[in-house]
Amino acid sequence: MRKLILLFIPLLVLVACQSSNVDEIASEITEESIMDHISVLASDEFEGRGTGTRGEDKAVEYLVKQLKEIGATSGVADGSFIQPFPLLGQKTVSSSMGITRLSRNTQVSQFKYFDDFVAWPANQAEKVDIKNAELVYVGYGIQAPEENWDDFKDVDVKGKIIIIKNNDPEYDENVFAGKTRLYYGRYTYKYEKAKEMGALGAIIIHTTPTAGYGWNVVSNGWSSENFYVKSDAGADKGSTEMNGWLTYGASKKLFERAGLDLDDLLESADSPDFEPVVLKNTGLSVKLEAKYRNINAKNVVAKIEGSDDDLKDEYLLLSAHFDHLGITTPVDGDSINNGAEDNAAGVSVLLNMLKGYKKMQPDIKRSVLATIVSAEEVGLLGSEYWANNPTVPLGKVAGNINLDGTNVYGETKDVVIIGYGRSTLADLVVEEATKVGRPVKPDAHPEQGLFYRSDHFNMAKVGIPAIFPNPGTNYIGKTADEMRTIDSVSAANYHSVNDEVNEYWDLSGAVKDARLFFKVGLRVLNADDIQAWHAGDEFEAARLKSLNK
């Protein structure tokens, strides 16, 4: 027994030393070290870091320099740290949509662009000319085997335009997670499914309750320039020629032409027994013309190699977007959208965490991969490109911590993560936060679908267990009135020229959270196994596919 005790004592000393080393390195993440990068990236010199602009180039140059100073190596094969990717800017310049009587091939009614509908080419074509297309109402347009749900039962939609109800079913907490908006409820899923099913077009019915925002958001957003990852020459762009939205009023008029009651059909979609409905003798003719411009964007990818020969080809993926909105129409003489909170702050936290992992390099088994992406603000396109063109095998990525914003308004008692309860990675956050007496909470507004609105979503789509840390809500030392003021200021500054460092900023909360997630990352780096989605999660199948299971 004495010999066992003597053998055990050095092990305890080793563990204590390692723990002390972790705390010491984590303590080097300070308010000053976080502000250092924010003050540079959010300065006017970087011109708002717009995608494909001179400001983006300046940001890339700065990031590569910082990564080299940290001691990271390039995460792309050519050693440049830069993953370029081509984008297309698309703007619809001419459009018409009319209801037709199929039996006579005649138009009987015309919708008004912007007021009744918005539409655009779905396959990066310059012109679309659809005549007398048949219409099929497909409810939510969802196929979800894990929910025993198929809105395309016994119907062939090839060559037809499908009409889709927005969102996903909310009638039962045990079906599609109740009021929590899953990816099935996002408009991107609807359009992807239309392409997969071979539909000629896809139109989503807008209502404010199902969208969570008014028609003005749809009409203003989709009538402006939109962006896409450019399809490779000769690539299959799919058979879907157009996508769009239709107002509730215009949709009601369309269904009445077919002798159908829209409200009844919207209600009927809330059942696994729903069957698609053909709009008899009623079609649509659609003409669109769009203009395009080419944009060259850049991701920055870096690596810190792990020390374990068996595990160093597996990775903790840290992600953050460095782009913002660039230069826009002046407001009170200011035209630069500096993007301090969104997302110079998140990039700074990533760089600070990476610096800590470099110092711990002999003690980390797996490697760290940092993807600092562009084009998040125009549709999560930088992370989409990386996920579809990964610089390491997807099955080798142990988990993803996405840093989009941070807590710039002071310390909180609690921690919020988007992705709470969905993966073993989320469980690690709970374990580490519990050690320091901080409760972990889920997203307070699951109906907004925040899980699908930042770069970690593209990582999840290809199977990588991912979390998105958010500021806590229980602030320390702030009154209710103070928090109302801060909330109001933060909301007003979001996506505006006023997103700059201001008098309300207090980075003590950012430090506290960054140190916590630094330790969560260490758990991923040194765990026996890579992270996993919990059984039944919507991304579990993608993970198993990436692991060839």
Show which residues each predicted segment covers.
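N-terminal hydrophobic or amphipathic helices/low-complexity stretches enriched
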Residues: 17-77, 97, 250-251, 257, ...
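Active-site-adjacent substrate-binding region
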Residues: 175, 195, 206, 264-267, ...
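Noncatalytic luminal/extracellular "stalk/propeptide" segments of secretory-pathway proteins
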Residues: 47-172, 280, 424
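Bacterial Sec-dependent N-terminal signal peptides
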Residues: 1-25
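Soluble metallo-hydrolase cores and metallopeptidase-like ectodomains found primarily
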Residues: 21-22, 101-105, 118-154, 235-339, ...
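Acidic/histidine-rich catalytic neighborhood of metal-dependent amide-processing enzymes
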Residues: 183, 189, 193, 209-210, ...
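Metal-dependent peptidase/peptidase-like ectodomains
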Residues: 112-115, 127-128, 229-261, 373-479, ...
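Extracellular/luminal Protease-associated
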Residues: 23, 113-234, 305, 338, ...
